[in-house]
Regions:
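Short, low-complexity, charge-dense intrinsically disordered segments
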Residues: 3, 10-21, 27-39, 43-44, ...
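Proteins enriched for Cys/Gly/acidic motifs involved in redox and nucleic-acid/cofactor modification
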Residues: 57-298, 307, 337, 342, ...
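Terminal RNA-binding accessory module
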Residues: 69-71, 438-538
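Short, solvent-exposed loop/turn segments at secondary-structure boundaries
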Residues: 149-151, 264-269, 299-305, 366-369, ...
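Flexible glycine/acidic-rich beta-alpha junction loops that bind and position SAM and/or redox cofactors
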Residues: 181, 292-301, 334-337, 356-367, ...
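Radical SAM/AdoMet-radical enzyme domain recognition
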Residues: 309, 314-318, 323, 335-394
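Intrinsically disordered, low-complexity polar regions and short flexible loop motifs
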Residues: 326
Length: 538
């Protein structure tokens, strides 16, 4: 592809001659960044680079005005350079040029929220950096679903105690911010900004207040009007995009803080969802992951609007979209129409994440999960009856207050019955503002650990058996990075990693360079409990 690369370089030079001069590669692609080798003396190159022909996102910024252009280099469809987002939304604020850094804890929704935060600040002239040392403003976007996750945040904040003269603005965002509020200032006095997920559009104003001399500022409103309004101007992945379609939760599980930290369920209009999907497709994104705490509870707020299954089909029909994923589903709202949609639309990925939490009906009732063991297994049977082979993953909590040995045995037997392709298992931890907090933490930590090991060991046996059944089969894989098993430099021939439609990780060897972002055929040669190993099939 050398000729195409040169043409791309010339086009960029011609269209942006005299503008400043900087491009940077998003942090997650720093190992596999394409060296553009811009020849003009007006350009300055930042960051590392490696093998030719890879898919990269490159950022250009100007001195005259702030428009930022994300430029996609795509050797599959030919080279092109186009703006993503308009200059009219890029006005410079008094904080223009201030550097910020975001560290994200938790799930995909938090990762997507961090993209929203970056979008808000980039649109006001701030500059995102990948090195915390280079940042004037440091944000920790937090998770509080489990005690360990929240403790990790405060541990990270504690590192600043050793450096009182760091000179940075420290901000706590997300669920811990919403849950703890101003108490964070008491636990970590060097924090100066606390902002919940419903107030991210206010971040430039909060930062301006700090600049004006205020010592501490908060954005902890519960107003949900802005939930879906934040424009994403910079995404962390150049071919896979997150898109939140429902925020909050109405299920009120006894152990869960989400209704408190995220508020009640509210769905985005299908018209707005489809408009953004079309924009993403036009910008070169081929895989969309629809997000929600209970994503399948989606209901279009418009009169006689789309159901979740209808929305899945509509998103998959957008020209340029090759894969559609969704997470996380709640069993109560999971119906036959979703399975039928997956069965009939190839672009809908054949994977469902359906958390069960326990195999015991008695514990499920105590958890307020609104279904029984048998009702849940009926959902699994529905999924397994599909014509396509749909993979199923789940979440399990051990050590819930009052859980007995018999309850644990029922969970282990449910693993056998469900034959999951993957399980995320956790020890119960009491969380503030939850019903289970009043039940006490009745299971000793050592016993929780023993029960967790039982679940993990049994599930490991199931996964290796299921993965071994796939040896010899060929799957389409979206290559999304260099494999941890690689023996050659990132971007060169050797080891790559990607995901199948069923969301299995597949490490693969290939004689070809430049596979990042490509859909390729891979034959499985070996299996492990958590991934597959295969060879690129030409």
């Amino acid at each position: 592809m050398p000729g195409e690369r040169k043409g791309f370089q010339h086009r960029v030079h011609r269209e942006h001659r005299g503008e400043q001069t900087r491009w940077d590669i998003p942090r997650c692609w720093s190992e596999t960044a394409l060296d553009l080798n811009l020849e003009s003396g007006n350009w300055k190159r930042f960051g590392g680079a490696s093998g030719a022909g890879e898919l990269s996102v490159v950022r250009f910024e100007t001195e005259r005005m702030p428009p930022s252009f994300d430029v996609r280099v795509d050797d599959l469809t030919g080279t092109r350079a186009e703006p993503r987002g308009g200059a009219e939304n890029q006005s410079v604020s008094p904080g223009s040029g201030t550097t910020f850094y975001i560290e994200t804890f938790g799930c995909q929704m938090n990762a997507h929220d961090s993209e929203k935060v970056a979008g808000v600040l980039l649109g006001r002239g701030y500059q995102q950096v990948a090195d915390i040392e280079a940042a004037k403003v440091v944000f920790y976007n937090t998770c509080s679903i489990r005690e360990k996750a929240a403790q990790k945040v405060f541990s990270r904040l504690g590192e600043f105690r050793k450096h009182p003269d760091h000179g940075k603005v420290i901000g706590v965002l997300g669920c811990v911010a919403q849950q703890e509020g101003e108490e964070i200032f008491e636990r970590a006095p060097w924090v100066s900004l606390v902002c919940g997920s419903a107030s991210y559009s206010k971040l430039p104003t909060l930062l301006a207040e700090l600049e004006a001399g205020n010592r501490r500022v908060t954005g902890l409103d519960t107003d949900t009007d802005e939930t879906f309004e934040t424009e994403i101007t910079r995404r962390d992945n150049p071919f896979r995009a997150y898109l939140t379609i429902i925020e909050g939760c109405d299920k009120s599980c006894a152990y869960c803080v989400v209704p408190y930290t995220r508020g009640p369920e509210r769905s985005r209009s299908s018209a707005s969802v489809l408009e953004e999907v079309r924009k993403l497709a036009d910008a070169g994104y081929s895989e969309i992951q629809l997000l929600g705490q209970t994503v399948n509870s989606y209901r279009d707020p418009a009169a006689r609007g789309m159901t979740f299954a209808e929305l899945l089909v509509a998103v998959a029909a957008v020209r340029g979209i090759r894969r559609v994923r969704f997470t996380t589903s709640h069993p109560r709202d999971f119906g036959r129409d979703i399975v039928e949609a997956i069965d009939s639309v190839p672009a809908l990925c054949d994977h469902v994440h359906l958390p069960v939490q326990s195999g015991s009906t008695r514990v499920l009732r105590a958890m307020q999960r609104t279904y029984t063991r048998d009702e849940y297994l009926e959902k699994i049977a529905l999924i397994r009856s599909a014509r396509r082979s749909i993979s199923v993953t789940s979440d399990i909590i051990v050590g819930f207050p009052g859980e007995t040995e018999e309850d644990v045995a029922e969970t282990l037997s449910l693993l056998e019955a469900a034959q999951y392709d993957g399980v995320f298992a956790f020890q119960y931890s009491p969380r503030p503002n939850t019903a289970s907090l009043q039940m006490g933490d009745t299971i000793p930590a050592e016993e929780k650990g023993r029960r967790l090991a039982l679940v993990q060991d049994r599930q490991r046996e199931i996964q290796i058996a299921r993965n071994n059944e796939l040896v010899g089969q060929t799957f389409e894989v979206l290559v999304d990075g260099a494999s941890r098993r690689r023996a050659s430099p990132a971007g060169g021939p050797g080891q790559w990693a990607g995901r199948t439609s069923s969301n299995r990780i597949l490490n693969l060897s290939s004689p070809h360079a430049g596979l990042l972002g490509q859909y390729i055929q891979v034959r499985v040669t070996r299996a492990s409990p958590n991934s597959l190993i295969g060879e690129h099939v030409n």
